[in-house]
Amino acid sequence: VSPSLSYARIRRWICAATVTIGILAAGTVAAAPAPASNLIIYDNDFFGPESADILPLIGDPSVKVLGFTVVTGDGWLDEETADILRFLEIAKRTDIPVVKGALFPLVNSEARTRAWEGMYAKIVWKGAWNAAGPDNTFHPTDPYLIPPSPVGPPKTKPAPGTAAEFLIEQVHLHPHQVTILAAGPLTNIALAIRLDPAFASLAKQLIFMGGFVDTNLQQVTGSANFATDFNIWFDPEAADIVLTAPWAKITSVGGVSNAVVYTPELGARIAAKATPVTQTVVKYSQALPLWDQITTAIAADPSLVTGEIQAYMDVDTDHGMYYGVTHVWPDATAPHLGERKVHIVTAIDTKRFLDEFVRDAQFPVPADRP
């Protein structure tokens, strides 16, 4: 725990908030709260020179990003932190703090994953644990290595403290107003829940990219790489903690995020307006599903959702064949051992999503901002 943001300080926030609520309750007339902006903290495993997933957030004037928190997932923490810091420099949005979080999952590890593969099945995408390559794109045994980036290293530094502490601080400063948006493994969110039991209930809602169900057949008939619940199985214990916490609302963006893939045609639309951001996005984007972009777009504009179902959801944490697999139940058959009802997005307005994504990617980058 950093000296600047200790657990004792977190407790003082909680106590101060309690006293304030008591004073307001004692008064005969309370002032009406001012309308809140769409306040969001975005937690992700930012990896690569283009962080196009943040564009629906920083390109939408109705959204106020309180901060970006970083977690190991697709890459290691330090490399991911450098990637998002550099992209924010390109976008001239270094006013938004970036806070480092968990370097490792709560329980899972590379060794455990290799052992699981030896007993059950090969995992195509292992994120930070992918086999090492000649260019250090992946370096599974060196979590502190930051390979050279094609867009150069960042000059800015991450904010002090840890992601979990920052998450807790912000929901106490803005109770019931902050959307916790997660598109990577859920380690940071789980740590915040364990540090402060009031954290989840003080947030406005949780939206997360994950909760892919019925992926087994999709791995046979489609892509074994795309039909995977990486964010869940990378840290199943964290996912279990998060999905059993008392959120006001939980939204899962799972299989629907496979529906839209980055194409040259989309790149051409984005490139029609030349800015440092659009040039970076078009140059480094790959032909992959827009998993995180769809998730952030839904957080910025919930009306993009055209279909959803509700079900109870949790994650298998037994270290067997189904370790890290998401399960859903109707109310009648759910075990009711703490799992929560989740809004599972099943359809979005794809045309409007793409139109808004192009618009957000082309946001005017201020020339006079450092």
Residue ranges and their predicted role:
Residues C15-A26:
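Bacterial N-terminal signal peptides
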Residues A115-P134:
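A charged helix-plus-loop insertion that forms the helical arch/lid used to bind
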Residues V1-I10:
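N-terminal secretory signal peptides that target proteins for export/translocation
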Residues P35-T94, S109, D135-S252:
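Active-site histidine-anchored catalytic micro-motif
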Residues P35-N38, A52-V65, F230-P370:
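Conformational coupling and interaction surfaces
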Residues A102-L106, T187, G210-V213, G254-V261, ...:
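Glycine-rich beta-alpha junction loops
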